[in-house]
Amino acid sequence: MTVRFSPFSPSDASGRAGASRAPSRPAAVGRAAALAAAGLVLLLLGLVVVRLPWAGDLGMHAATLQRLRHSPLAPGNPLVDADTPSPYYSPWMVLLGGLARVTGLDVFDVLRLAAAAGLLLLVTGVWRYVRTLSANPAAPALALLSLLLLWGTTPFLWSGFPGLHSLALTAAYPSTLTLGLAFHFWAWLARALRGAAGWGAWTALGVLWAVILLCHQFSGIVASAGAVATVVAARAARVVWPRVAVASAVGVVALWAWPYYDFFALFGAAGDGLEPVHRALYGQPAARYGLVLPGVAALVARWRRDRRDPLAVFFLLGVVIVGAGWLSGHYSWGRALPAVVIPAQLALALAVVGAGRRWVRAGWAVLLGGALVAGGWAQSGALGYVVPKDALPGVVADRYRAPWKGYGWITPWVGYGDVVMARGRAARQVPAYGGYTVAPGYPDFFLPDEARRAAVTEAYFGARTPQAVRRGAEREYGVRWVVDRGGGLLGDPGLRVVARGPEGLVLYAVR
């Protein structure tokens, strides 16, 4: 089999040649500095895993583990007491749920293990993939620093967007593991395309692609774009194409066969429900992604040398997807923004160790160094998750986002499977401890009566709602407990105060 593919782009040819020579003193110092900086950043993330700060969707994933832990074969809806499928029941979460069931570990401890595994896969995946692009020993560390710090001057916290501050809050999410798998997938695919990979390897690649898509659909789109770019860059001989087709077919079959939810139903289930919340992805591009611009310049240089450069093609595919989302109003397509950002981040890191005159590489190094310093400063608030806020300088403390307070205070009364009437943030957190809510705290497109549940919940907490209406809602949904903030329900004779939590929260028992 003849495959015209080189694991290194022309821009990095000198890096490969230089690997066999003794490095110059400046290069050795630079490599040591990059490794030390990457090590410090990873140490910070490791310490964050121990604390596991909660600000966002952590409760959703904890609730998913609760259901899988108690009923691994038929978990039902993770948030409400209903027998519906859920896209949160991914292969990774099923595995973690089994771990929780076998070991008896608390779901938050399991999520700490998930965070550690996700970060490990992300770091090793970046290392492996970058080694397919450059043999320079400093390249992986520079690429990892770029991935974590080259975003914008304003931290942007969203799952699947692996900035340092974002990862500090989302390391336990399936998106982190999925992105790590994506990097491994691209590295494995690149090697399969240039080597004599057998049918078994290609079948495994197809299964891995399906697992990535099942674990986090948005990151799966990014992974798919990167895979297409890798195939385009390979200039593979015709004999390889049947194997690519088989891998794709195996992946589609695996997606179809997954028993916990219908993957293909997701394409029509959401409707326009995802678009309003995702419009924010397109806002403030300079503040959120501006530090990536030098990487775009590096991509242009790579593309001029090779029209099929994998990073350049990856970037262009990402631009097409994200741009189409903006033009069509499908703002959820903005979740593919990492397909735009990641190639630029890697391109800038590789430009520092690539081919060309020394002064050119020095220029790229200055750009990268300045951008990393700016990005590190922008995301310095992540230090607040391992250092007490009072010990931080004021300008750093101002960048810190305080995590949410947990709802462990309700657990002496609320048992597993109890239905709790809750709204707002409470509805996002209560299911993490085993309870159900009446209305889901997150959009659920497989729940047919979601709108009615939301309306019932809103009416229940209305100041002028008759007691008879509240009692009817309690009977209909089997409500045993109510969580509310303030004293709006204190005069209701059908409720009894049993506990008070932080920030004015009150737990009522239904009489």
Predicted regions and their residues:
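Extracytoplasmic
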Residues: R4-P7, S224, S380-R511
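Transmembrane catalytic cores of multi-pass membrane glycosyltransferases
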Residues: D57, L208-V313, H330-A336
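Transmembrane alpha-helical segments
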Residues: L122-V130, L169, L181-L193, A225-V232, ...
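Hydrophobic/aromatic-rich transmembrane helices and adjacent perimembrane loops
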Residues: V222, H330-A365
